[in-house]
Amino acid sequence: MRTRLVLGLIAVSGALPGFTAADSAPIGPGDSTWAIRTVLGYTKTGGNTDNSAGNFLFHAAHVMGKWKLLFGTEALYGSTKGETTAQAWLGYLQANYDISSRFYWYVGARYDDDRFSGFAYQAALKTGAGYKIVDTDATKFTVQAGVGRRRLRPQIIVKDAVGGIVSSTEEDEETDTILDAGLALEHSFNQYTKLLAGVTVQSGQNNTLTNATVALQVKMTDRLALSAGYKLIDNSSPPPGSGRRDTLTTLGLVYELKNEKLPPDL
C-alpha cells in the first residue's frame, strides 16, 4: 500500500528570482513601494518508498524613486529513508537604476550553496543592463545581461546506494569572469490564469550555472491562487561523482501581493 501527501504554501508579491510584476494591491495601507513573495512547500511519500522534501522561497522588492532594491533567499531539503538526499540554499541582492521607462542598469550579488551539486559554494558579483521588451497589462517580458566575477569551490562527494553523502572533499577555490544573463516572463491568459517563467545564467570558464523556472497559476480570490511549478538547475562542469542537473516539481497555494511599479523577477 502506498500513500502520498503533497502540501504547498506560496506567498507571492512579485515574480521569479529578483523582480516583481504588476497588480493593484500595495503591501500595506498607503504603501505601494514594497512587494513580497514567499513560498513554502512540502512533499511526502510512504509505503514502498519513504521520501520527503520541503522547499522555501522569499523574494522582496522595494521602490525608491528611480531605484529598485531586490533581495531574497531560497532553500530546499529532501530525505530518503531518513537520509538527507537534497540540501541547498541561495541568497541574492540586486539594485536596479531606471535610465528610462524601459531601460535600466543593475548591480548585484548572488550566493549558491548546494551540498549535492559538486560545488561547496558559488558566489558572484555582477553588473549590467536590462530592458523591458514587453510591458502591457497582460504580458511583461524583461531581459538583462552583464558581466561579473565569481568564486566557486568544487568538492568531490561519495554517495551511498540511497543517495546520501558518505564523504566529501573540498578542492581549491577557483575564480573566473562570468557572463550574467536572465529573462523573465509573466503572461495573463485571463483574469484567473497566468504563466510565470524565468531563466538566469552565470557562465564562466569553470562552470555554467543555469536556473530555469516555470509555473502556472490559477486565481481563486484577490489574494489566493493555486500554482503548479517546475524548476531546473544545471551545472555544466560538475566534479566527478556529481550529476549536472537537478529538478523540482511543486504544487502549492499562492498568496499574492503585487506592485505595478515592479517588473517580473530575474
What is the role of each PLM region?
Residues 1-33, 257-266:
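Cleavable N-terminal export/targeting peptides
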Residues 34, 66-71, 102-105, 137-141, ...:
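Repeated loop/turn-to-beta-strand initiation elements of outer-membrane beta-barrel proteins
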Residues 36-38, 69-71, 105-107, 125, ...:
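Transmembrane beta-strands of outer-membrane beta-barrel proteins
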Residues 42-46, 64-66, 75-79, 111-115, ...:
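Transmembrane beta-strands of outer-membrane beta-barrel pores
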